Amino acid sequence: MAKLSPLTLIFIAACLSRILHLTILSGLSKALPLFDTSPSLLLSSPPPALRWDAIHFASVAYNGYEYEQQVAFQPGWLAVMRLAGEGVRFIRAASVVELKDVILGGTIVANVAFVAATLVLYKLTKHIFNPTFAFLTSLLYLLPPTATPSAPYTEPIYSLLTFSGIYLLSIKRQMVLAGLCFAGATTIRSTGIFNSITLMCFAVFGDAHIFDLDPKDYCKIRKKLKPFLSAILVVAPFFMFQHYTETVFCTRELKRASTARPWCSNSPPVSYGFVQKLYWNVGPFEYWTVSQLPNFALAMPILFSSLAGVVKFFSHLVSSSQVLNHGTEEIPPPPILFELYSVHVLTMALLLFTSHTQITLRVCLGDPVVWWNAVKLGFDNVQIGEAPMGQVKVNKFGRYWIGWTVVWGAVAAVLWAGHYPPA
């Protein structure tokens, strides 16, 4: 019998994880009463996938943008859900698409995207580190501390587009295709604009390490058009959607009647910050209250590993640059990691200081650095050469991480099925 490749094993494990998780959620939703009846506003017998933000996603995908608070969500995933719903309608030979078609279609796409994202993460990690590191990263990725990969949420497809963009950029050197993937990610989540940093830095620095550049090279950057065009491609979907919201909520008729929304008088009239602040209480330090301490505690394992991983990476980056300048040997990290860790720092800062911090548990799915940090901190000898599996040992932090993701993942499934907080 032929030995299965690591990629095949990961594919099988990812598919089994989706089947198992969907089965568990289905059973739990039948056994648990809904703590909040919001899902019943859309369907009298809501499926387990219809919880929290999925309620908004399904509503907009089916009815379009009806209310101001809904423009907090980028339109990309909602369009995918609608298209998937049309596919379900076609398969069941119905004349009109129904809300349940949209929910089922979105659930299928999200689960397929999660499996695909896991495979792309393995291939990306294998090229940057080594096969053992990549295998462990993928296995940890299949133990997320959230139930959202099984639901019609933005994270799975956002992760797939982001990982694919990084892979196409750093491994295949396909800048245009990478830019399209990153732009697609921005249509899914507004944080996709951070990927413009990765693309622009790669266009400027290429395979050079940032500390190896001569000061004259920085002066040349201002004369280059390509990096800025790349960045515009990635951020364009965000501003295009803001223009759309302006045309809907800031019409001349509404302005004449003095009934236009307050943000319409801003220059430029951007709705995003206003809506996030008014309806979702998102803003600098808005979440820093005593009552939210439990939610900070939930995100602490990721925040702690992020801090430790960032300090370790940039310390290595600086020290490797210094020894190279002195002629001694120390292998510096691959150049692409500087961009990815920089984006990681921005993302974690946004989650810690501005957002609902507990969403770190699901936003982490789209950030490969989170999972690389977990492997670096949780396993010994994993970055040495090819790192044969027999030489790699799980340490105390690794056991804690695995235990935490398993236990909290199970708790999160129960909370999700019963529509219990936190979201």
Curated annotation (Swiss-Prot):
Root EC class: transferase
Pathway(s): Glycolipid biosynthesis; glycosylphosphatidylinositol-anchor biosynthesis
GO biological process, one term: GPI anchor biosynthetic process
Family: Belongs to the PIGV family.
Family matches, as InterPro entries: PIG-V/Gpi18
Protein's UniProt name: GPI mannosyltransferase 2
Keywords: Endoplasmic reticulum, Glycosyltransferase, GPI-anchor biosynthesis, Membrane, Transferase, Transmembrane, Transmembrane helix
Origin superkingdom: Eukaryota
Keyword Heme assigned: no
Topological relation to the membrane, as annotated: Multi-pass membrane protein
Cellular component per GO, a single term: endoplasmic reticulum membrane
Transmembrane segments: 7-27, 102-122, 128-148, 151-171, 191-211, 228-248, 298-318, 333-353, 400-420
Keyword set includes Transmembrane: yes
GO MF assignments: alpha-1,6-mannosyltransferase activity; glycolipid mannosyltransferase activity
